[in-house]
């Protein structure tokens, strides 16, 4: 640089020399002049060469007043490493020096003059804002001049540390905020401003605190700001001269952010980071799993930058490590994507915590997730030795830009002091909100409960959510089921009253193992969807660390205790640790107690825990009285039991899962696998279920004496005492509720401890059932309602003896026809087995009894009682004092069964059977079961032949010569599945052949293929012949007289006749028409599946309305078809009786009691409509409950001792005016269970 001349003309010159113009690289002679009265303001001039300047031959090529300069900065670009840039309001002027020393000397000279000029200008013009007062001392290493050495007394104006001229691109916020074009990016110690060219006011001022991240790519630089910025969240993209400038911008801005972090560090240290033991309370977490809003971040945003003491690349080389500021939540959600290892690893506040985190992987960088409030630890907490180099890769991926990343790894992880990669790294915040905190990373950062947790508590307090897992044997569980489970069953758990955030109450030695608890404790997230955090520390109680992918095991805990429903599972699994079902998933809690190797939950023992958390409104924990745990949450309206654990049913009950892998889903109060848990194990036959059958499975839900009623069956139980199921090929999961609500809950479906070897086959597959009905208020007690429908199939079904308790429909009785189970009576066995069972001994034998080692298909599909609600309700406990002996009614619109009702009467009523192409083979119960091959496989499901056991009429009707078999004994239920030998065009679903107990048997064998139910009703008159049209009241009378006198005889007669609305037989009722025969019932047509009150449920069957005016004159009433298909005398009048509604709903199927022969004097009204039923009604539910005790005369004109009401005649017999058993409660669909009291069958 040439020395300024001493002459007067050059007295104001401060510096001269040759410098280059950056673009052209031409050398020019520059002169720096100070302000003078003669020469004017301080200015920078350049000339073509020194000669021209000295000789004053020409004016300077350019003169730039320093007062007008926006800012003066050192710069560098790809061409020139030593630039000094002057920014004016309208242009950017740069000079390039050949060396750094030269650059610095010019820069200092310019800066001094600029500061003076600016000060003078500000003092004179009072222009303070926007002036490019001296470039304030920049952070070291940025090449900025330090302080203004010659300010004199003039304070410099607000100085911009750096100014870059950039072109904002129409992208991101640039477009939305219309910030496009040439701007100056002006950096101060706390802000970044965009000042448009030729403008003095900043268009946008962004706080450094608002910046989430910044980066550069090539010659583009971007800044992402959060929603706290004035512009809202978004990015600014700007183009600069080249990548070197972009990189310089990136590094400079990061350095400024680091400086600000250092400035605020002391304050944040005092706030939180310095003391882990005093966590600040933080706002409740939202469910932003990974991106809690900045508002949720808890600390001031500054804390973001505080804690991490990473150094920028430069500082890492020589800078102080603490200077690097890693941005925490608000800073850098943007940087989340970039890993930022922090160089300091905090001293772990508690050994437990540190330990707990140790097993976590290294540097788990969590997405913005954890902006949430990582409360970074102050550098003081961080052990410097732990420093690990910050990976400074910026989001832009440029190498050095990475400093910015480190500076704000917007992930909270960065904000935590301590490198996430450090195994011992622990977030200072107790909430684990910092992403580095593994807990927080995977739980939706839920610091809530932690606010008050002493850090020493470890993660125990973190589990503020329901620990749906294991429970201690003796300790009560918190209402929400918190358990801190130790594997051995220490049962560490929070006491029910304990606040989640508070330290748990430890019982016994648990206090000693508090550290383990803390370590073991895991915070639960509200959303199960988030991977549950694994146990953070392996404690002795935990076998392994569950993978974060493990599924939450939600096992509600109830305070142990008897009826209150405290149901402590025998063993609880730790909250997140799945049971053995998912061994790879995580820790497994061993059962706290297993007695005798058998799962024996009862009041004295711990209840097994439930697989489901009770989500139904009315479900109460099952009282301790229950013996076991059901597999499924009772979804039936009246179910009382709490859901059972289904996560690992095999572990709890091997039998719970059928060989096909289906879980037993029976919702009923009694577990669908009804157990004859009673002392009597004689029902082994009932237990023995052929594994071969695809559908049916037999099981008993009775206790004790009921077993005696089950005929011994040669086959051993399918299920061994070990509970292993023999493979059953059933395709369906049994979804039907189980009936024995009094004694069993879902937990009761398994044998009680006293009878562990007696295990039902659980693979009974029935079509899904909806609900079960409970005891009706008006139902008779004890044996009055007992009914034994014996479907004596040739294949050897077990006899079903229902007791009062069986009223609740169970899968066995309802869905599987358990209520109507056919049982092959051994010839030696007396009928007393058919007699009324002990009321208190519920017994259900599924129709799917052994059938040559094959399970029978379910007899019906029951859809639940009319008032069944879709919402699960705690099922009402049936009083054992008033058991329902009749099996629960099937609730399906179509019970796909062929039901043949057999009677012990002298003869079967001859009915319109001529047209039956497929005779229903009726076999006396004493007959040996026909071989399985004999059993017809063609009929769709099962046909129940309901006719008095007389082979004469039976042969007549069926055309099958069974005479050699001998007459069926009076008590024998003459029901045989038609053998294959007997050709039959099976009705598609059910052929209900119902004959009244008379000498003439109305064969109801499935005749022409009825689409759903072929309901043949035998007319209770001997003279009635095949297609007889009418039936006289006298016929019914004679039928009544012919029937055995005494309650049983009347009951039997009533059972069959009332079935049909009286002795007349089923008048115009299709197999599943719910015939409301009770005179007391609402006279208006009812909707099936709806109680008389009018609840209606539509099913895919046509609506039929019966009209009381018309009397049925034909055995065949064309219900569905409107024409007598098989009935020769199909009376058209019946069609009007059964007015067919066009709507396909199942409404109005209820026959009015009056027209059904509500009085004994109108028995003929029900004159067989059986024939016509073949084509017509798809589903008919016969509502035929008759209380014979109250109205014996209605059944038979001749006075007889009032027989006990035929048990389980669904919904009021047509003649019984007293049938007020809340028939409505009964199933609206074909519950045709008409077993007569077999006393006459002795």
UniProtKB/Swiss-Prot annotation:
SUPFAM superfamilies: PH domain-like. The keyword Nucleus applies. Serine phosphorylation of IRS1 is a mechanism for insulin resistance. Ser-307, Ser-312, Ser-315, and Ser-323 phosphorylations inhibit insulin action through disruption of IRS1 interaction with the insulin receptor INSR. Phosphorylation of Tyr-896 is required for GRB2-binding. Phosphorylated by ALK. Phosphorylated at Ser-270, Ser-307, Ser-636 and Ser-1101 by RPS6KB1; phosphorylation induces accelerated degradation of IRS1. Phosphorylated on tyrosine residues in response to insulin. Ubiquitinated by the Cul7-RING(FBXW8) complex in a mTOR-dependent manner, leading to its degradation: the Cul7-RING(FBXW8) complex recognizes and binds IRS1 previously phosphorylated by S6 kinase (RPS6KB1 or RPS6KB2). Ubiquitinated by TRAF4 through 'Lys-29' linkage; this ubiquitination regulates the interaction of IRS1 with IGFR and IRS1 tyrosine phosphorylation upon IGF1 stimulation. A motif (YXXM motif 9) lies at residues 1012-1015. InterPro entries: IRS, IRS_PTB, PH-like_dom_sf, PH_domain. Changing residue 608 to R: May contribute to insulin resistance by impairing metabolic signaling through PI3K-dependent pathways. There is a cross-link at residues 1186, 1189 (Glycyl lysine isopeptide (Lys-Gly) (interchain with G-Cter in ubiquitin)). Changing residue 307 to A: Impaired degradation by the Cul7-RING(FBXW8) complex. A motif (YXXM motif 8) lies at residues 989-992. The modification Phosphothreonine is found at residues 446, 453. Residues 12-115 form the PH domain. A motif (YXXM motif 5) lies at residues 662-665. A motif (YXXM motif 6) lies at residues 732-735. The modification Phosphotyrosine is found at residues 465, 612, 632, 662, 896, 941, 989, 1179, 1229. A motif (YXXM motif 2) lies at residues 551-554. Signaling adapter protein that participates in the signal transduction from two prominent receptor tyrosine kinases, insulin receptor/INSR and insulin-like growth factor I receptor/IGF1R. Plays therefore an important role in development, growth, glucose homeostasis as well as lipid metabolism. Upon phosphorylation by the insulin receptor, functions as a signaling scaffold that propagates insulin action through binding to SH2 domain-containing proteins including the p85 regulatory subunit of PI3K, NCK1, NCK2, GRB2 or SHP2. This is Insulin receptor substrate 1. It comes from Homo sapiens.
């Amino acid at each position: 640089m040439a020395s300024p001349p001493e002459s007067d003309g050059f007295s104001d010159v401060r510096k001269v020399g040759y410098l280059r113009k950056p673009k052209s690289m031409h050398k020019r002679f520059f002169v720096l002049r100070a302000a003078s009265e003669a020469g004017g303001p301080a200015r920078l001039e350049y000339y073509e060469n020194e000669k021209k300047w000295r000789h004053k031959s020409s004016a300077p090529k350019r003169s730039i007043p320093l007062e007008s300069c926006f800012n003066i900065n050192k710069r560098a670009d790809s061409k020139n490493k030593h630039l000094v840039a002057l920014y004016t309001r309208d242009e950017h002027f740069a000079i390039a020096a050949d060396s750094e020393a030269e650059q610095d000397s010019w820069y200092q000279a310019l800066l001094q003059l600029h500061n003076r000029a600016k000060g003078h200008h500000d003092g004179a013009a009072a222009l303070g804002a926007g002036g490019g007062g001296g470039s304030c001392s920049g952070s070291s290493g940025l090449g900025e001049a330090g302080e203004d050495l010659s300010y004199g007394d003039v304070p410099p104006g607000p100085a911009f540390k750096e100014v870059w001229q950039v072109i904002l691109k129409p992208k991101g916020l640039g477009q939305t905020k219309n910030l496009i074009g040439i701007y100056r990016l002006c950096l101060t110690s706390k802000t970044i401003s965009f000042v448009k060219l030729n403008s003095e006011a900043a268009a946008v001022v962004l706080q450094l605190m608002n910046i989430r991240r910044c980066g550069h790519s090539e010659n583009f630089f971007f800044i992402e700001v959060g929603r706290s910025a004035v512009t809202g969240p978004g990015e600014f993209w700007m183009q600069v001269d080249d990548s070197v400038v972009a990189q310089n911008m990136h590094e400079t801005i990061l350095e400024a952010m680091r400086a600000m972090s250092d400035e605020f560090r002391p304050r944040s240290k005092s706030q939180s980071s310095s003391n882990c033991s005093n966590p600040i309370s933080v706002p409740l977490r939202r469910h932003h799993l990974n991106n809690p809003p900045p508002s949720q971040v808890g600390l001031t945003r500054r804390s973001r930058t505080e804690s991490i003491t990473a150094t920028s690349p430069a500082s890492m080389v020589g800078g102080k490590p603490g200077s690097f500021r890693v941005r925490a939540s608000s800073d850098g959600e943007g940087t989340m994507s970039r890993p930022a290892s922090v160089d300091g690893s905090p001293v772990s506040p508690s050994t437990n915590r540190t330990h707990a985190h140790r097993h976590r992987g290294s540097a788990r960088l969590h997405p913005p997730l954890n902006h949430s409030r990582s409360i970074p630890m102050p550098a003081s907490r961080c052990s410097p030795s732990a420093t690990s180099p910050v990976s400074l890769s910026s989001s832009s991926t440029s190498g050095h830009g990475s400093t910015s990343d480190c500076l704000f790894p917007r992930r909270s992880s960065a904000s935590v002091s301590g490198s996430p990669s450090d195994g011992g790294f622990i977030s200072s915040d107790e909430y684990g909100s910092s992403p580095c905190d593994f807990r927080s990373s995977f739980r939706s950062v839920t610091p809530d409960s932690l606010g008050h947790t002493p850090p020493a508590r470890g993660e125990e307090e973190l589990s503020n959510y329901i620990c749906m897992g294991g429970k201690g044997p003796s300790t009560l569980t918190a209402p929400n089921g918190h358990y801190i489970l130790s594997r051995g069953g220490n049962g560490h758990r929070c006491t029910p009253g304990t606040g989640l955030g508070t330290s748990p109450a430890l019982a016994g030695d648990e206090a000693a193992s508090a550290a383990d608890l803390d370590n073991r404790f895991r915070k639960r997230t509200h959303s199960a969807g988030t991977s549950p955090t694994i146990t953070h520390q392996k404690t002795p109680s935990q076998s392994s660390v569950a993978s974060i992918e493990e599924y939450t095991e939600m096992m509600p805990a109830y305070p142990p205790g008897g009826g209150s429903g405290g149901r402590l599972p025998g063993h609880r699994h730790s909250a997140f640790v799945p049971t053995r079902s998912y061994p790879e998933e995580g820790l497994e809690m061993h059962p706290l107690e297993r007695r005798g190797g058998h799962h024996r939950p009862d009041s004295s023992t711990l209840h097994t825990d439930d697989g489901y958390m009770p989500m139904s409104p009315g479900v109460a924990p099952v009282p301790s009285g229950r013996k076991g745990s059901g597999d499924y949450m009772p979804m039936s309206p009246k179910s009382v039991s709490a859901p059972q654990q289904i996560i690992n049913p095999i572990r709890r009950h091997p039998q719970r899962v059928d060989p096909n892998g289906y879980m037993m889903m029976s919702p009923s109060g009694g577990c669908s696998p009804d157990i004859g848990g009673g002392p009597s194990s004689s029902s082994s036959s009932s237990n023995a279920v052929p594994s071969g059958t695809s559908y049916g499975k037999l099981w008993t839900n009775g206790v004790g004496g009921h077993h005696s009623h089950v005929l011994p069956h040669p086959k051993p139980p399918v299920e061994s005492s070990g509970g292993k199921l023999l493979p059953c090929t059933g395709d369906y999961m049994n979804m039907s509720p189980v009936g024995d609500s009094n004694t069993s809950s879902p937990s009761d479906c398994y044998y009680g401890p006293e009878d562990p070897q007696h295990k039902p086959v659980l693979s009974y597959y029935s079509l899904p059932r909806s609900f079960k009905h409970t005891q009706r208020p008006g139902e008779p007690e004890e044996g009055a309602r007992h009914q034994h429908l014996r479907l004596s199939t040739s294949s050897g079904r077990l006899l079903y003896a229902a007791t009062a308790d069986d009223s609740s429909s169970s899968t066995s009785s309802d869905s599987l026809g358990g209520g109507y189970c056919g049982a092959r009576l051994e010839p030696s066995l007396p009928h007393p087995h058919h007699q009324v069972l002990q009321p208190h001994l519920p017994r259900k034998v599924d129709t799917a009894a052994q059938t040559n080692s094959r399970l029978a298909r379910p007899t019906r599909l029951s859809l639940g009682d009319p008032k069944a609600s879709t919402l699960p309700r705690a099922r009402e406990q049936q009083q054992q004092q008033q058991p329902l002996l009749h099996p629960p009614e099937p609730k399906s619109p179509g019970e796909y069964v062929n039901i043949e009702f057999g009677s012990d009467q002298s003869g079967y009523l001859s009915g319109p059977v001529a047209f039956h192409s497929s005779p229903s083979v009726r076999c006396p119960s004493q007959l040996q079961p026909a071989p399985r091959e004999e059993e017809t496989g063609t009929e769709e499901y099962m046909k129940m032949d309901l006719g008095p056991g007389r082979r004469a009429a039976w042969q007549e009707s069926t055309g099958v010569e069974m005479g050699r078999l001998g007459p069926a004994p009076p008590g024998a239920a003459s029901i045989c599945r038609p053998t294959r030998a007997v050709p039959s065009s099976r009705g598609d679903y059910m052929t209900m052949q119902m004959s009244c107990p008379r000498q003439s048997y109305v064969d109801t064998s499935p005749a022409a293929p009825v689409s759903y139910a072929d309901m043949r009703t035998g007319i209770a008159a001997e003279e009635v012949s095949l297609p007889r049209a009418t039936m006289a009241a006298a016929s019914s009378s004679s039928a009544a007289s012919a029937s055995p006198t005494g309650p049983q005889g009347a009951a039997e007669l009533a059972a069959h006749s009332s079935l049909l609305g009286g002795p007349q037989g089923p008048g115009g009722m299709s197999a599943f028409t719910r015939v409301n025969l009770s005179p007391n019932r609402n006279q208006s047509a009812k909707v099936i599946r709806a109680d008389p009150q009018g609840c209606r449920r539509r099913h895919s069957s046509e609506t039929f309305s019966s009209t009381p005016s018309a009397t049925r004159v034909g055995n065949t009433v064309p219900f569905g078809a409107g024409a007598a298909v098989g009935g020769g005398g199909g009376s058209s009048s019946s069609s009007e009786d059964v007015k067919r509604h066009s709507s396909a709903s199942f409404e109005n199927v209820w026959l009015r009691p009056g027209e059904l022969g509500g009085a004994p004097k109108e028995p003929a009204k029900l004159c067989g409509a059986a024939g016509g039923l073949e084509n017509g009604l798809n589903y008919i539910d016969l509502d035929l409950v008759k209380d014979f005790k109250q109205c014996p005369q209605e059944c038979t004109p001749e006075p007889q001792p009032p027989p006990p009401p035929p048990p389980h005649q669904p919904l009021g017999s047509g003649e019984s005016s007293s049938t007020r058993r809340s028939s409505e409660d009964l199933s609206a669909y074909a519950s045709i269970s008409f077993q007569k009291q077999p006393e006459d069958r002795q």
